[in-house]
């Protein structure tokens, strides 16, 4: 009898815990073949200045609040990148336009780099130095920089010193985007938004407003290879002998005739597209993680999902209260977006443990 009451008490406590859980996402697709690990992201939805971890039911299971001063108004919406470090079970996050921070499970944190323009993406080297993007800077400013572990800038790269004009990289059917970039002039000229490191030590640097990403030799800063023709490129990530990336392709020259054709692209080693996944079914993917099972974990403006290399959706969770098929409706979906950073709500999510 005593065991019955113990079990009943445990069951009631579990039900109350579930009932009181804060839910960020609603899960619409799940599959026995999916990666069942939890998901971490900077909270750009609720208005709370924090990093959160959610389970695959979309419920918050851990959170960490940014200290006062790290987030200024809606700066959190300016490219809050995140990485998970499995060996230390910690998170490295960007407080956009403030710093790159390592956050531990016990709530302690360490600032790894500080810069008033840091955002989007970063790479932490073994010696503690940090390579990071400076996404919204104007022509002539550093688009990427490295700070050593003491906070001193030891390397930088300016797009305009190596790439003289954007127009030679344009010419797609997506005239509306190219027109918007041109109208800004020198403001937000290159829009650095992605970083990865090749096995040979060279850097892969992504420039959205060039619709291209570049392999750069770090000692000289010289561009040794160009990967062009990927409209509004986001998150070019090494995959097999090539890359997986998100593009923002479309047709049309203004809002009235623009048709979204955005997709996840798989390329070969030369950047030639071999496959397009989810074409026309998403709006602005800004996070792609290659998972240990060979699938892709994708973050769009309203959704986190796992897809296999053929584009089959194995897991899909959407911001609570949002239509799960809304993004396939293209720009007509934008007025219906809700959340702190609408319409570009989610930035990047990653799998944890």
Q: How would you label these PLM feature ranges?
A:
Residues 22-353:
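Histidine-/acidic-rich catalytic cores in large beta-rich domains
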């Amino acid at each position: 009898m005593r065991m019955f009451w113990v079990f009943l008490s445990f069951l009631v406590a579990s039900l109350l815990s579930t009932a009181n859980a804060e839910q960020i996402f609603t899960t619409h697709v799940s599959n026995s073949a999916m990666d069942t690990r939890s998901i971490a992201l900077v909270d750009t939805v609720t208005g709370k200045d924090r990093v959160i971890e959610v389970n695959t039911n979309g419920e918050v299971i851990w959170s960490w609040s940014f200290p006062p001063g790290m987030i200024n108004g809606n700066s959190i919406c300016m490219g809050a990148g995140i990485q998970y470090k499995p060996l230390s079970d910690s998170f490295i996050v960007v407080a956009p336009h403030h710093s790159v921070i390592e956050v531990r499970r016990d709530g302690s944190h360490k600032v790894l780099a500080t810069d008033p323009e840091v955002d989007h993406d970063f790479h932490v080297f073994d010696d503690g130095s940090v390579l990071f993007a400076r996404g919204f800077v104007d022509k002539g400013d550093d688009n990427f920089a490295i700070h050593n572990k003491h906070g001193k800038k030891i390397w930088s790269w300016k797009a305009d010193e190596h790439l003289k004009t954007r127009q030679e990289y344009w010419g797609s059917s997506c005239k509306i985007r190219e027109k918007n970039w041109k109208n800004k002039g020198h403001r937000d000229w290159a829009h650095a938004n992605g970083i990865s490191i090749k096995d040979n030590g060279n850097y892969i640097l992504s420039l959205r407003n060039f619709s291209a990403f570049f392999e750069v030799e770090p000692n000289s800063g010289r561009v040794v290879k160009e990967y062009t023709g990927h409209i509004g490129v986001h998150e070019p990530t090494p995959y097999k002998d090539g890359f997986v990336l998100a593009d923002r392709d479309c047709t049309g020259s203004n809002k009235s005739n623009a048709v979204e054709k955005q997709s996840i692209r798989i390329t070969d080693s030369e950047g030639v597209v071999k496959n397009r996944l989810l074409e026309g079914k998403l709006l602005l993917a800004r996070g792609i993680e290659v998972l240990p099972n060979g699938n892709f974990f994708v973050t769009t403006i309203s959704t986190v999902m796992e897809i296999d290399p053929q584009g089959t959706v194995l897991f899909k969770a959407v911001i609570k209260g949002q239509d799960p098929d809304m993004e396939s409706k293209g720009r007509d979906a934008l007025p219906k977006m809700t959340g702190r950073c609408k319409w570009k709500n989610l930035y990047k999510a990653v799998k944890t443990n």
